[in-house]
C-alpha cells in the first residue's frame, strides 16, 4: 500500500515536492501515477470485502497524531520531529502549573471541554478494544496519560476551582503562528462555585475516571490519584450546577459552547465513576437523577458537546451483562439510536452521502462519523457478549425489526473504509495514509516551516501567508483525520476551508478504538 512508514521517514516533506508526494511514499512518477489512477478507478468498483486496508498501520497513525497535538515539554521519543516544546509557561502568571495537554485542532488554544472528551474516548478505546492494539497499546496508553496528566493538574491545582482553558481564542484566531513561538495571550480560565461549569467539570470527571481504569494494573498509585480527583471534580460539578458557557461567555463561545447544557455531562460523569469505582452510590445517583438529566430524551448524535447517547450505550452494558433492571431504559434508547443508523430498519432516520458516509449538517462531519462508528462497535461487543440483538421496533412493510452485532460491525466497517479510501474521491481522509490524502490540513504547525527548518520567529501577521498559500503543508501531520467531504462526497483540499480540512483530537479519539477492532479481527 502507498503509505508513510512510521519507522523510515522524518514526517517532514519539502514545501515544493514533485506531484505533492512524500519522498518515502511508494507512489512513483508520472507514468506510475497514471496507472494508479486507472487501478484506483477499478478498485472503487469492486466489493468492499475485496478492498483491503492495513488497519494496523492506520491505528498506529491515528495514535501518533496525538503527538503532533501535544503542548508542553516534549519527551525525547516524540515521533513528530518537526514539533518542539511549546506553552512552557502556561499558567505561570496565575501561579499555577498548566503546562501540557493537547491543542484541540489547528489552533494553539487548550480548550478543556473537547480535551477532556478526547481523553475519555481514548480511554474508552483502550478499555474496550485494547486487546486488539498489540504493539500500539503502550502508545495508546501514553496518549491517554498525556491528557490525563494535564486534567489532573487542572483539577487539583487550586481547591474549589477547575481550570478549563488556556489562551484567549479570540486573540489566538487573529494570528497564524506555530505553537513553538506563539506570542498571543495565554490567559487562564477557570470555573468555581460562583462561576460554575458542570458541563466541563462533569466531562473532566468522566475523563479522569475512565483513565484511572486504563492504569489500574499498569500504575495502581496513579490510577488511584485519578479516581480520587474524578470523584472530587464530580462532586464539584453536581454541587455547583451551571453551564460554563454562561460563566465564561465569549471566552468559550462560539468555539466550544455547551449547547446541550450540563445535564448530559452529569449523567455521563456519574456513569463513568460507577464503572471505574464500582461504588453503588454512583448507580443510585444515576437511578435517582437519570430522567431529570436526560435519560428519556431522544438523541441521535454523540460529540464533545452532547453525551446523552454515549451515556446510554455505556449504561446499557450494565443491563445486558448484569441484568440491572434499573438500566433497561438505557438499553431501549441505545437500541433506538443504533437502529437509526442502520438502513432498512424500522427506526432508520440517518442521512448518508451517495458514497455511503454518515452525514450530519454542520461543521466537521467526521466527528459524528467516528463517534457513531465507535458506539456501533462498542454496542456490538455488548450485544454479542450477552447473545442479544438491538430491537428496532415494528418490522412491518419489509423493514427489519432487529439488528445483530454482526450487522453493526458491517455498518461500522463501511464507515472506517470510507475514511481510509473506499469512497468516490478515491482518497484517504487520514493524513499520511495511502497515496492520496489531504495535503493542506487547516493546522498552524503543519502548514508552516518547522522551528527546526526555520528557527527564526514567524510573526502573527506573516503567518497568514502560509494559511492562504496553495502549497501543500511542509510538515505531515501523520494520522490526522480532517473534517471530511460534504453531503455529495465532494472535498476541497483547501486550508481555508476549515470545516472540511481541519483535524481535531475528538475526531481521532473514537477512531482509535474502531481501528483497533478491525486491526485485531480482520485477516
From Swiss-Prot:
Glycan-bearing residues: 279
Signal sequence residues: 1-52
Keyword Signal: yes
Enzyme class: hydrolase
Keywords assigned by UniProt, alphabetized: Carbohydrate metabolism, Cell wall biogenesis/degradation, Cellulose degradation, Glycoprotein, Glycosidase, Hydrolase, Polysaccharide degradation, Secreted, Signal
GO-annotated biological processes: cell wall organization; cellulose catabolic process
Active site annotation, chain numbering: 107, 442, 493, 502
Keyword RNA-binding included in the entry's annotation: no
SUPFAM superfamilies in UniProt: Six-hairpin glycosidases
Catalytic activity: Endohydrolysis of (1->4)-beta-D-glucosidic linkages in cellulose, lichenin and cereal beta-D-glucans
Single GO MF annotation: cellulase activity
EC number in record: 3.2.1.4
One annotated Gene Ontology cellular component of this protein: extracellular region
Subcellular localization(s) per the UniProt record: Secreted
PANTHER family tied to this protein: ENDO-1,4-BETA-GLUCANASE
Protein family (similarity comment): Belongs to the glycosyl hydrolase 9 (cellulase E) family.
Descriptive protein name: Endoglucanase 19
Organism in which the protein naturally occurs: Oryza sativa subsp. japonica (Rice)
Organism classification: Eukaryota, Viridiplantae, Streptophyta, Embryophyta, Tracheophyta
